[in-house]
Structures are given as structure tokens and as C-alpha cells.
Amino acid sequence: MGGQCRHLPESELDIMLVVWGARGAVSAPDILAGLARPLTASALHSYLKRLEEKGFLTCEKVGKVNWYTPRISQKAYQEQEGKSVLDKLYAGSLKRFAAALYDGGALDAREIDELRRYLDELEGGVK
């Protein structure tokens, strides 16, 4: 799919989260069952087609069933979206981003310790 994937609207991201969570090929009825918000089968079909066109999914028809698999990993998408948010909202500054999380109450002492340990591991060359 290339090095850059596109940002997904919330409805398409919800579908991709179900597909990524399946850890293999998944059918439309399985996707519908996995969605938190109700969606009609025809609306889901439109979203799936769009995700195929954007290069996020592949579809293989087996008998009468379409099986969908991701073409981009959840990790790759998360990395791209994280970098995009960091660049757009915090001018690429991780310090500003962490400060916003802390000031907004999204980071507690345990999470700060986890982040500190992770950064120490990165500095030590361990991943």
C-alpha cells in the first residue's frame, strides 16, 4: 500500500478496529456483530467498498461469502496517526503532547512511570 496511509473517518476506523481484532479473514456479518454502533448491512457494504478502494482492505469471495482482510496493520496505522497528531497539533513536540495529556488529566502517576521506563529502555537501546 505504500508508505503513507490515509486518515480514516470514525465510522471507517470502527470497522477497521473490528477487522484488526479478528486476526484473520472476517465476513460482513461478523463485522456487524463486532461493531458497538448499529449499522445496516447496506451501509456496511458501502464502507467496506470504500476501505477497499482506499487500500485498507482486500476482499476475497468464497462461495457466497466475502472475506475481508487488512492490507495495512493496526500498528502501522497507529504510528502514522500518532505522528500526524503530533505534527499537526503539537508542532512535532512530544514534550508539548505529554504536557497536554498531563494537564488534561489523561496521565496518572502509573502511566508517567510506564512512559519513563519506556523512554529509559529506548535510551539504553532496548526495545
Describe each PLM feature range.
Residues L8, G21-S27:
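Short capping segments at the starts of secondary-structure elements
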Residues Q80-G125:
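Amphipathic alpha-helical dimerization/coiled-coil segments
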Residues M1-M16, G125:
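Short alpha-helical segments that sit at the start of domains
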Residues D14, V18-A22, G34:
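Short amphipathic alpha-helical elements of helix-turn-helix/winged-helix folds
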Residues G55:
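Glycine-centered, phosphate/nucleic-acid-interacting loop/turn motifs that mediate DNA/RNA or nucleotide
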Residues A25-L35:
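Short acidic, hydrophobic short linear motifs in intrinsically disordered regions
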Residues H45-K49:
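Short, hydrophobic-biased segments on the C-terminal half of alpha helices
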